């Protein structure tokens, strides 16, 4: 965001992200789930930067014009041609991820601290943490916490402590 401000100083421009990266794998199922987890990680980062997310690389994949990773790998909606020539549409894991962020977050981001968060893996010199999270609250004071476990193979236990609240939402 700061780097963008130098190109349009004082103009009130807000950078908008128009594409999310692609997670490649041999099987479409793992690739679809992996891509959704990747999107969750990126969205947490972008929200932290104060940058809106509005678009996706490929909204709909049609069987006759699928992206180069194959049907359903990169799109939000997969089109499926039926035997009678009509087309049906189904949500992908990426669509579910957008739904979680659009419907299960509050309007105000609140602070959080993750202790003991180890590196899950390293990609091109960038350390990917085992857990990534974002916390927010709405106008009624409801608290939302979205946690992403970046390990495909390991279960990750998370202990939550919310200042001044128990997990039923009652004040302490």
What are these regions (language model features)?
Residues 1-3, 90-100, 131-147:
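Extended, compositionally biased low-complexity polar/Lys-Gly-rich tracts
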Residues 1-25:
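Glycoside hydrolase catalytic-domain groove-lining segments
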Residues 4-11, 48-50, 166-168:
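Secondary-structure transition/capping motifs at alpha-helix termini
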Residues 10-14, 49-54, 140-142:
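Loop/turn elements at helix/coil->beta-strand transitions in domains of secreted/extracellular proteins
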Residues 124-169:
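Carbohydrate-binding surface patches
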């Amino acid at each position: 965001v700061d780097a963008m401000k130098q190109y349009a100083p004082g103009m009130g421009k807000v950078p908008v992200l128009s594409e999310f990266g692609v997670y490649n794998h041999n099987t479409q199922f793992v690739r679809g789930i992996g891509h959704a987890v990747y999107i969750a990680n990126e969205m947490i980062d972008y929200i932290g930067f104060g940058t809106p997310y509005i678009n996706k690389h490929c909204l709909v994949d049609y069987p006759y014009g699928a992206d180069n990773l194959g049907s359903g790998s990169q799109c939000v909606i997969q089109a499926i041609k039926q035997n009678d020539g009509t087309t049906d549409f189904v949500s992908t894991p990426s669509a579910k991820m957008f739904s979680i962020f659009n419907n299960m977050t509050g309007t105000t981001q609140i602070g959080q601290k993750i202790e003991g968060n180890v590196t899950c893996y390293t990609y091109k010199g960038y350390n990917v943490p085992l857990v990534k999270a974002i916390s927010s609250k709405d106008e009624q004071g409801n608290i939302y916490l979205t946690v992403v476990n970046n390990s495909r193979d390991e279960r990750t236990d998370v202990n939550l402590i919310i200042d001044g609240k128990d997990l039923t939402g009652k004040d302490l």
